[in-house]
Amino acid sequence: MFLAAAVQMRSGNDRAANEARALELLGQAAGRGALLIGLPEMWEHIGPAREKHAFAGPVDGAQLARIREFCSKRAVWCLAGSIAELAQGPGGRSAEGSRIYNTTALISPRGEIVAAYRKLHLFDVDIPDGARYRESEQVAPGDAPPAAIETSLGVKIGLSVCYDLRFPELYRQIGADLLCVPAAFTAYTGKAHWEVLLRARAIENQAYVLAPAQVGRIGPANENRFAWEHACIVDPWGDVLADAGGEQEGIVVAPIHPARLSQVRRDLPALQHRRRDVL
């Protein structure tokens, strides 16, 4: 058994302030004994793409340096939410004005980036509450699904980002024991779907789900964009083990039992009953 923590934070367009707050919340989680701590989507910056280009770089560059240092010092695993990755072109250069990737990473207790994943599904939606989202105008989609990552925690971890949550085939293909969903889910869609989708992915895959989240307003004041909040952790039976609720920043912590995975999969062996010859 080990403890996992999901961070709930309110990111703005001041990257330095966001990083300081993220490290503070990571410290709180580690102080409570969490060995796996997840940051939300876009923890480092929420704002115009032109601002992201000022600091975006490769995933193993400066953006995650302090998070990696934290992991090494505190001997914890970290789901690094998502950052603005600027892909490198010929000669290590990036074309000016090129789109970024919305990239998550898993960092080991040695401070090593053991896996990274570029968000596949981009959120281009007009919300009935009046908010308009066109992620593809700023972000390029990834082109490869993530693989399950073996860890010293006794579970295989799978990576995804926010809107990926609506595509169940992605999680079935990963085949992980613990599914990570760092998010900035909208308040309008989150109220109806956030918990339902997280629980569904947990039940379908008989896996734990770790879902860090943004809280409050996301984006400029003149844009009607609010995050749903409710960072949470769900068990393989679909029970919500911890929920951060709304409005406030903070962390939630819950135990992850590898034995619980085995029990659920033994008692209801749905994964063994898949008709791979047909589907």
Please report, for each region that a protein language model flagged, where it lies by residue.
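Extreme N-terminal starter segment of soluble prokaryotic enzymes
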Residues: 1-5
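Short polar catalytic/cofactor-binding loops
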Residues: 8-14
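Cys-nucleophile CN-hydrolase/nitrilase-fold catalytic domain and related Cys-dependent amidase chemistry
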Residues: 15, 23-110, 116-118, 125, ...
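CN hydrolase (nitrilase-like) catalytic-core segments centered on the catalytic cysteine
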Residues: 59-79, 156, 161, 165-250
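Short beta-strand scaffold segments in enzyme catalytic cores
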Residues: 80-82, 102-106, 147-149, 231-233, ...
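Active-site catalytic loop in hydrolytic enzyme cores
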Residues: 89-174, 187-196, 200, 267-270
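Residue-level detector of high-confidence beta-strand sites
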Residues: 103, 115-119, 181, 243, ...
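A conserved C-terminal secondary-structure "cap"
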Residues: 260-279
